[in-house]
Amino acid sequence: MTGRIRILATSDVHGYIYPHSYADSSSKDIGLAKIKSLVNILRDENTLVLDNGDVLEGSPLMYHHFVKTPDEVSPITRAMADLNYDYINVGNHDFNYGEEALMMHLQNAGAPCITSNFFYHGKPFGPNYVIRQVAGKKIAIFGIVTQYIPNWEKKSHIKHMRFVDAYLSAEATVKLIKRLENPDYIICMYHGGFERDLVNGRLTEDETGENEGYKILRNIRGIDVMISGHQHRTEAGKLYDTYYTQTAANGAELACIDIYPDNNTIEPRILKADIDADPEMLKLFEREEATCQAWLDQTLGTTNVDLRVTDEFDARLHKSQVITFLNKVQQEKTGADLSSNALFLGATGFGRDITMRDLVSTYVYPNTTVVKKITGKILREYLEKTAEFWMIHNEHIVVNPSYDWPKPQHYNYDMVDGIEYTIKVSNPVGHRITSLTYQGNDVTDDMEFTIAMNNYRATGGGNYNMIKEAPTISTDLSSMVELLANYIQEHKVIDFEPVNNITVIK
């Protein structure tokens, strides 16, 4: 249409190129190859194509790349260059493999990175904004990322970086654009989500600064379109005079925002990737994909216990023995008194023959292991926090809805081995741990323990501030998948007795 301006945007692709599940090879409507087919249909001379971050981490293909060929340009980076983006933003997970990996990605992705609210070696990493002329109109575009990254990321990965408050940065940038440019439209790419319900404005999470999308929409006048991300939600609408979008993860959706200057209208919509994948992109990565698939099918060892997860709810309610195994490995590796792990969304567990595919489908993040020193008092606070995962509804134990919406956060329910404890869900929050023992003795406030956990939790991720403040004893830089694979290959046959140390009651 003459005069129509089109914005196409991806977010939270998480390393997915191919349209299938790496857990069972089933076909799925995901991946950048399908997104490219959509873009090829929708793109014209009046179109801008943007990516809103979280590209490098997530898929087994990318994990395999960083384990085996980290000095090469990654498949997803080359796929982005093939799709030919105009501008890109960074997300929090793009820092997971370290500074060198991020810089190699940004230097080879084929599009300028315009993230403006973090400093690298003391200097702004990206421009404050960029200007593009599209269909005779002047468009200002800027990118920001959640400033909460230092609360999750390994310090070594961001040691040369400083993050500025995303909201304050957006506010200052919009003022600057208005004063210097007087554009027809302002587009904000924000790798962050919404902290409030978009309908009634009620808080849906603690106001930590992780997500400030609602605050930006409500308070900053002049942004015409905000492309959000991070929470993997499907959203398209208008609030406080600003249009917004957010897409599901793994390349399952594409945001399409059509701007019609002639009648001053904007139409945002979310398109599903239910289309044939682009054959040229699939062909580009045949070798890497085949190598990854062969690696995933390696048998590492066997176990005398069936550790498959068939019901995630039950696996959390009654602590699946796959958690017992993960904790056992962490404890043996670190020598810690206690160990904690969460069952991630979609985790498959292991059959009696354990393959690398089982590992990466069960432990889906590139986390490392940290040992913390805690007191009995801190341990109880920690368990009370994790017990918030449960609630009573119609006299049944159910998952607290805040762990499902606006973003699934099942990874924030930890299960701890090395102690025995009972969660009474009907008790008030903060008073649910009714029994807590260590080696048969009641845990007292002044007792001291070492506890192994992932680096995300060790930095206070999930609002576990009591853990963040606890002293760090040691850090193992091996990924948890690497640690598990080495353990299984060393032992060949994993033989252990099931441990049922957690009781959850009404």
Language-model segments: residues:
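Acidic, metal/ion-coordinating pockets
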Residues: 1-280, 317-323, 328-329, 388, ...
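Feature captures C-terminal
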Residues: 4-6, 16, 30, 34, ...
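Short clusters of hydrophobic/aromatic residues that line enzyme substrate/ligand-binding pockets
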Residues: 17, 303, 307, 359
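Short, flexible segments with low predicted structural confidence
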Residues: 52, 77, 301-303, 310, ...
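Intrinsic-disorder/low-complexity loop/linker signature
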Residues: 122, 201, 304-305, 310, ...
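Short, surface-exposed secondary-structure junctions/capping segments
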Residues: 283-287
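Acidic, glycine-rich low-complexity/disordered segments
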Residues: 289-298
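Glycine-rich phosphate/diphosphate-binding loops and the adjacent beta-loop-alpha structural elements
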Residues: 298-319
